Each structure stands twice: as C-alpha cells, then as structure tokens.
Amino acid sequence: MSSVVVVGAQWGDEGKGKITDFLAQKADLVARYQGGNNAGHTVVVKGKEFKLHLIPSGILYPDKTCIIGNGVVIDPGVLIEELKYLESEGISADNLRISGRAHVIMPYHRRLDEVEEERRGANKIGTTKRGIGPCYVDKIARVGIRMADLLDPEEFRARLEQNVAAKNELLEKIYGVDGFDAQAIFDEYRAYAERLQAYITDTSVLLDDARKEGKNILFEGAQGTLLDIDHGTYPFVTSSHPIGGGATVGAGIGPTTINKILGVVKAYTTRVGEGPFPTELNDEMGDLIRKAGHEFGTTTGRPRRCGWFDAVIMRYSVRVSGLTCMAVTKLDVLDQLPVIKICVGYRYQDEVITHFPESLKKLAQCEPVYEEMPGWMSDTTGCRTMEELPEKARRYVKRLEELCGCPALLLAVGPDREQTIELGEAF
C-alpha cells in the first residue's frame, strides 16, 4: 500500500490535473480533499481535452474509484452537469463516491459571494463568485448543510428554512438585493439529492478499507500552497487548505498513512486574481509566456499573470507541505527562450531575504534577485527520458532541485498524458 498526495506548490494552475491523471495509472483510488468548483483541471488524453471542476481526474480510468472527500464544498447542480458531460463523452462515473460530510453550496452562497465582492470595490480579493467562501463560512459557523442532510427531507427543510431566513435578512437589509424562496430551493435540491443519492457514502471508511487491503491511494488537491487560508498570501487566498496537511483533514485519513507528498510546480510562475507577485512580468516576455503556455483560467477564462520561476516560493512550499518530491510542468513553454531567469531571493530595503515573508505589505515591496541561465532553444515536446532533453534543459531542472531542496520525480513537456518524463516511482 502506498498513499501519495498531489499538491500545488505555487498559486494553483500548476498542472495538477495532468500529473494526477498520469499517476492515476498506478493508483486504485483517487480522492479530492478540498476546494470546490472554483478550481478547474484540464487533462489531455491522446489529443482529447477534458475539463473537470469537481470530479477527480482519475475518473478517466474505468477501473479507478474516485472520491470527493469531506473537505470539498459541492454545488450539486454543477456536479450533475459534470456527470452529464462525462456521459456525453462516453465516460462512466459509476465508480464515483461522495462524502456525506461534504458541505453543499446553496444559491444564497453564490449571491453573497457576488454582492460581497462588489462591496469591496478596489479591495476585491478576486473570488470566482461561485459561493465557495460563503459555504466554508457557514461550515465554520456550524450552520452549513451537508450532502447527508440532503438525503433527509425533514432535517434538510429545518436547516434550510433557518438559513434562508437569516440570509434573506442579510441580503435585503445590508446589501439591498432580493432574497430567496426556501420552498423553491428545497424542491431544487431534493431533486439533486435523488440524482446523487447512489454516490453518497462514508468515504473515510472506504479509504481506510482500501488502505488495509494494500491498495494505492492518490490524493488530489486543488489550488496551491500560496492560496492556503493559513499559509497563503492572505487575504488573497482560498477558504480551505490546499497544502499537504489538508489531505488528512479533507479526506478523513490519518497523517501516518501518507507515504509521499508531491508538489506540482510550473517551470515558471503564474497567478490568477489579486495580490503581490514578486516575479511578475508586465512586459513582452510575460505576454510571450502567457501565449506559449495558454495561460487562461479553466474555470474563469481569465488571463493568468505570468513571471519567472520563484525558488523562494518553492522552498516555502517544501516546508509547509512537507514535500518529498516535485513534478515540474510546462518545461516546453520555455523552449524558445534564449535566457531564463530564476528568482533565488528577494531584495527588501537594504537586505536580501531567502524566506517567504509573512507580511503582505513586505512581500509587495520585495524585488526579485535573479540568477540567469542559458535557454536550450530547442523543442522538448517529444522527449520521454531525461537523457533525451537538451543539456541546458537538464541543467535547468538540476538547478531547480538544488535551489528548492526537493528532487524532481516527473517532468511535463506538453499537455498530453504521454508527454511526461518519469525520473522515479511514485508508488
């Protein structure tokens, strides 16, 4: 038995979907442990692109059990649309299981997300307005509705009526917008419950049984380390824990059951939304990387902010997630660059710092200290072994390993499942 956690080591969008899909070949179960449909992952199999938001990437394999864990917040309407999408592509979701402890995104969560972001004005945090944050707020406030509650009409109605009364007062009196009809929501979500009932179970027991049977388990995170509610660039963060430790809480398994934690990191850096970004390139080079890497959000379509690789960030991710290895993605995006820069530290006032600062104000004042490396100026998309890579590309990867203190396990040289270089075994 082996358990591997896949986490984003930057600000999300690192290519976790592709890496999870690749590793899922040798896994028996694939479990998603946090986030919601604010995150998207794209998987390319034999040139065919699949875009998913809630269902784990492992669903593309017919023999894998896929789990949506208790740490995920679920919009049932979105989930059902995703099931229909997979069905239209000839992919069965019979092996999907959903934790009854996962919290449910309600229509009032989406409305609150929208009006609160509008109220912030210039201080907006860049939410996707899909109700993720407000759903997690209700979870912490202990007034949330869980998937298991949807299956109990009496319990669901009681919780819903109480919540709608409170949310309507907030929406109407504070934000000046219309509230909701509890009966309409009840009818809509009971229909969702009927559709999803067969998938809902105690997934913690399922995972524990699999562990005892010696099966390989892959845990899939969403977003990235720097979007973690505690360890990210607060307040420009998500509402959950994308770091390695989030897997144990969000899937209902003990920390001693984890064998490897793999951090997925791009060969450069991107960010969506607001907040400081020390290596950001607001010039032609940034545009070039954005176009070459097709850097537009899976969920929002927003253009991603692009910059050079930041080793300060990666060392931070190694520390807070306990990364044992890394997967470097989109190495091919750098194929035609004559010079490539790596941020090795930050210049703050009169000193150079090598640790990621806690203060957002301090981070915003940091200037990157760069180390330059020669580009390889050749196509890597057909490479399948380390030896096939150009020497300068191999040197670049080696330097990233040295600066981050983390060995590379996988290299991605294109979006397709086959465009992956294995340097070691995950399971």
Curated annotation (Swiss-Prot):
Positions of the catalytic residues: D13 (proton acceptor), H41 (proton donor)
Q: In which pathway does it act?
A: Purine metabolism; AMP biosynthesis via de novo pathway; AMP from IMP: step 1/2
Q: How, per the record, is the cofactor bound?
A: Binds 1 Mg(2+) ion per subunit.
The principal location of this protein is cytoplasm
Residue sites binding GTP per the record: 12-18, 40-42, 304, 330-332, 412-414
Q: Where in the cell is it found?
A: Cytoplasm
Q: Name one Pfam family in it.
A: Adenylsucc_synt
The set of disulfide-linked cysteines is none
Which residues participate in substrate binding? T298, T299, T300, G301, R302, P303, R304
Q: Where does Mg(2+) bind?
A: D13, G40
Q: Name one GO cellular component term.
A: cytoplasm
Q: Which family does it belong to?
A: Belongs to the adenylosuccinate synthetase family.
Q: Quaternary form? A: Homodimer.
- What name goes with this protein? Adenylosuccinate synthetase
Corresponding gene? purA
